[in-house]
Amino acid sequence: VVGASGGPFNVHTMMFLDSLVKLGYRGRLYPVSSREEVSGLKAYRNLKEIPGTVDHVISLIPAAATLDLARDCVVKGVKSLQLFTAGFAETGEAEGVELQRELVNIARGGGVRLIGPNCMGIYCPASGMSYCPDFPPEAGEVAFISQSGSYTYLLVRMAAARGIRFSKVVSYGNGADVNEIELLDYLSGDAETEIICAYIEGTRDGPQLLRALSRAARAKPVIVIKKGCTPAGTRGASSHTGALAGDDSVWEGAIKQAGALRVDDVEEMVDMLVTFRFLPLPSGRRAAVLGVGGGASVRASDHCEAGGLILPPVPAAVRARLKQFVPLAGSMLGNPVDVLAERYADAWAPLVQTLDDWDEPDMLIWQISPEIEPLREEIVRQYMIDMRRRMMQVFCTARKPKAVVVHAVESGPGLESLEALRQMCRELGVAFYPSLYRAARAIGRYLDFGRSARAAPHSPS
């Protein structure tokens, strides 16, 4: 790590050196610094003084010093150089553009691959690689490539809270050498990756990117965030990573033609990841929704329809069976099924069984509203957590594909219940969402994607 420095509050050293130590990087770590020691590791004044081979170098030094660093990497036989360093083509200035060109020429001439510049680099849990101390150490099945470093923080943290883990995450910044096209091709053949996600602001080779997207989408699901869609966004993309953003309608058509799935932002990407990972593909759009609260049930009907799901009415035979164990006072035996029985464990199992046996719905969705529950702490612990754990286990016995909606809570004792419910879902591998609209939208798009993926081959090749 070239440019590492001491001190307990040096942010860059914490990001790029301490993260490797914390995640258990399996190789040797060498800080390059004017100090004798950094983070408990012996430091070296320059790359050439390090004994033995060096495979990968992370640059934290100013842009003006990177050409000499690249030359040292060539002499040392370094395989890859990742530059957190900014101040290159993304500035839009001739000096920065030329500096990036020279850097690429030196690296390519000496067989060194460049990641960046202006990027966070690589998070690979299986190898102990990270640039953030709180990223999960467990490896998963999702890969993410991103021109934006901050988007990798957003996605990894938000997805981790929903039970998603990653195989590889690459923030590639300006993409001066290794870029989105090469990364897509690599990940499409990566046995450790089942789903590919990408944040793209623009590209220097649209036709090649379209072909790479198409190749990847034939191998596994590909989910894309494309930003820089407005005139202001286009200018922002250029100044951020030097990307050529292009016309949004062209991008929309290209992503669809490639067979990839475009989403609006990180929140929707996480919802889609949860759906792909934890929800078996339903056979259709019909859902039976279990919930509590009359207003919440009415809202649920609107949100399901807006998201592309269908709520079939409960037929008389099913209603008659529900009446055998559901107290009519405080209940609504339509769909959504708003039942007071949700508060009584002895009625919950036959309720779930009845809806699971009902042949019309293709899936079950349980809507939980911690924000409207009793607020005394002892009730929170006894009912909202302990009883809900038993209810969750019963719900998971249903044969139909199932999802859970856990409404967000902003304050009060319900916060404890919220996190406990999320933890239950993570432990049981259940797809869960913060709102019914987001659940319906994700499941609806999942069904669309599943149908289109089966219907026709993607092009071009």
Question: Model-derived features: where do they sit?
Answer:
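Catalytic-core regions of core metabolic enzymes
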Residues: 1-461
